[in-house]
């Protein structure tokens, strides 16, 4: 069903209400240009290297310290992973292969190495170099976007892939070529909270909203404030109370031009302003924060 404008406004309003709590806790008021003194939350996260062959784990307050680094094993029909994310419906971590394979991921201490198992295959070929990859928690669908404007929606339950409308940034016409990271808000199973899709456009160096997601319509939230290299990562962590999202925190892996490795940033979801936390010791370009933070 195509979402109505009223429905979209309702979801955006709900997200704004949740984000206002996050802003009070973690960032300064929009327009002040300074970060609050509140410490970065220590959340367990996983990262994928830019070549898609290694995974690591770290906490969001110390991205400079990798607790382990392991090779990705078990790929079938793919040679590397492009991106990773957690699925709210079952708590599992998934990865996307460069040929469109979709995998569940097991990590230490459950296994010695990072072991992936193929569970599905995109029915539409990937088109692009760098990709955003995130689960819609409300619809239980995978959203995959690319720096060529590709906009896919995949159902892991019946293995179907829908090719949604190409990404655009009105009033400009033609594909929006630059969105290389994506993240949905409100990772819970409460229908009333809804969800909104954010993205990072490394061509315009902006944080953007994709709404409606199926229509591929992009609007600018705010500037990152520097020139970022194309391969980026974005993930949004939802703090839950009684199973419902009460705050949302954004994190991004971004590599300023001239830097040798990415830096982990917290992202102000109202303004797009990034605040550097620390630099990764490896080329970590895709992020997946655990659903519980531990």
Regions found by a protein language model. Give the residues of each.
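Conserved beta-propeller blade signature
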Residues: 44-48, 92-95, 141-144, 191, ...
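A short beta-strand motif characteristic of beta-propeller blades
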Residues: 65-76, 114-124, 161-173, 217-226, ...
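Secretory targeting and sorting signals
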Residues: 1-35
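Structural motif
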Residues: 52-58, 101-106, 113, 148-155, ...
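N-terminal carbohydrate-binding/catalytic regions of secreted carbohydrate-active enzymes
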Residues: 53-101, 105
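A mid-sequence, solvent-exposed acidic-amphipathic segment
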Residues: 179, 183-235
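An edge-strand/N-cap motif at the start of beta-rich repeat modules
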Residues: 38-61
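Repeated scaffold domains used in trafficking and secretory/extracellular systems
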Residues: 76-89, 121-138, 169-187, 227-239, ...
């Amino acid at each position: 069903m195509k979402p109505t404008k009223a429905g979209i406004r309702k979801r955006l309003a709900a997200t704004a209400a949740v984000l206002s709590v996050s802003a009070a806790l973690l960032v300064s008021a929009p327009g002040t240009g300074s970060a609050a003194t509140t410490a970065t939350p220590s959340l367990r996260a996983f990262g994928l290297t830019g070549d898609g062959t290694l995974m690591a784990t770290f906490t969001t307050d110390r991205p400079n310290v990798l607790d382990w680094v392991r090779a990705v094993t078990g790929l079938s029909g793919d040679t590397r992973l492009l991106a990773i994310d957690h699925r709210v419906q079952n708590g599992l971590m998934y990865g996307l292969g460069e040929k469109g394979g979709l995998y569940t991921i097991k990590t230490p201490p459950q296994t010695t190495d990072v072991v992936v198992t193929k569970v599905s295959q995109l029915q539409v070929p990937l088109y692009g170099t760098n990709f955003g990859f995130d689960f819609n928690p409300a619809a239980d669908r995978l959203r995959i976007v690319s720096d060529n404007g590709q906009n896919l929606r995949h159902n892991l339950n019946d293995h179907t892939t829908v090719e949604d409308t190409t990404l655009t940034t009105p009033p400009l016409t033609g594909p929006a070529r630059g969105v290389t990271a994506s993240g949905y808000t409100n990772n819970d199973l409460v229908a009333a909270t809804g969800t909104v899709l954010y993205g990072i456009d490394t061509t315009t160096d902006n944080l953007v909203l994709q709404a409606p997601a199926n229509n591929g319509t992009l609007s600018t939230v705010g500037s990152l404030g520097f020139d970022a290299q194309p391969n980026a990562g974005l993930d949004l962590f939802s703090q839950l109370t009684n199973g419902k999202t009460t705050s949302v925190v954004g994190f991004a892996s971004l590599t300023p031009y001239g830097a040798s490795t990415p830096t982990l940033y917290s992202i102000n979801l109202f303004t797009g302003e990034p605040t550097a936390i620390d630099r990764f010791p490896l080329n970590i370009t895709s992020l997946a924060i655990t659903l519980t933070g531990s």
